[in-house]
Amino acid sequence: MRIAYGVMGYGRGHAMRARAVLPSLMEEHEITVFAGGDAYAVLSKEFPTVEIPVIGYQYNTAGDQSVTKTIAANAGRVADLLGRGQAARQLEQDFRDRGIELLISDSDTWTHKTAQRLGIPRISFDHVGIIAYCKPHFPAELWAAGMRDAAGYRAFMGEPERILISSFYPAQPRKAGTELVGPILREEVLAATPVNGEHLLVYLNKGEHQYNSQLDRTLRLLDCPVRIYGTGFLGISDNLDFRAPSNQRFLDDLASARAVISTAGNVLAGEATYLGKPILAVPEEAFEQRLNASIIERLGIGMQARLKHLHPADVDHFLGQLDQYRYNMTELRQDGRVQARQTLARFIDELRPATRPTRQRAPQQKRRQALSRAVPDSA
């Protein structure tokens, strides 16, 4: 089949999940990836990828997510998306030119809306679906926010024909056609040999905004080396080693870390659990991250803290519980990749059209340009 694979471009976790399943899908199907932002930077190096706009959070000077800046920065894109502006119409044409028969989307609104408008069946494959398409499992302090975000996500994305959710923790689907699998682990993670080294690994998904003076002071006061990814800084300062993005080097540092301090993304939580690395989660203010951090603490595989108010005493308390966290992780290690591939294959077969649409081929030069162009940004 000719399949579009849409990937949300905010952060790298969506791209890592896609990267783990794309090679097997491409053995059986003709795949075009549609992604923007961080995901485009990762995936375009390995797969045929069309760049699309990104709707993402914006930050204020204090490093917090800013509602006003987020609305202002995304207003033009959202208007284009919902009102079938230039970028939305171009994306529809891209789908027609490639004869797209099916969409798999990892939290990407652009490809979801395009497939809906063109009557193309959809498979949602992400983590955030656990909020929208599973029965509520939110702690009391997050209940109202969870119900709000679940309703909002369903209103924006609709109800895809099939839903596959990858998560480091279990939940109960709301309806048939929804299935859960474990974390989607990369080959590099499965091949890694974990050892308990001396260093702590710090990862911030938007560290250029999140790395603050309080966190810097706390990390410098620790009596151990700290390897830091995601800030944009480079070089060694005291016990801090600021490192550039690198898949293999990051995984080597993860496998040999004593423990992890990170924002509360699902992908890293699954990888850290598989490798037996306790997690001190410092979530963004977004509900999904706050829920993940709460679950990490509830499962006993780490603890949560406020990023802007992290103190050495918090880290010391966390480090004092590492043995218990590691023990709890042994029963939660899982790799959902094989099950995800099997489920995707079954979903694709169930949604396969009885007759294929006639493909509207674009001129070869136009196709080459489409693979590298950025969809015009109306913001």
Regions found by a protein language model. Name each.
Residues 102-107, 247, 252-292:
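A donor-sugar binding/catalytic signature common to diverse glycosyltransferases
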Residues 8-9, 32-82:
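Conserved nucleotide-sugar phosphate-binding/catalytic loop shared by glycosyltransferases and other
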Residues 68-102, 109-110:
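Conserved nucleotide-sugar donor-binding subdomain of glycosyltransferases
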Residues 6-19:
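A short, glycine/small-residue-rich beta-strand->loop->alpha-helix junction that serves as a flexible
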Residues 184-259:
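Donor-nucleotide binding loops and adjacent catalytic segments primarily
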Residues 268-269, 273-325:
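Catalytic binding pocket for nucleotide-activated donors in carbohydrate/polymer assembly enzymes
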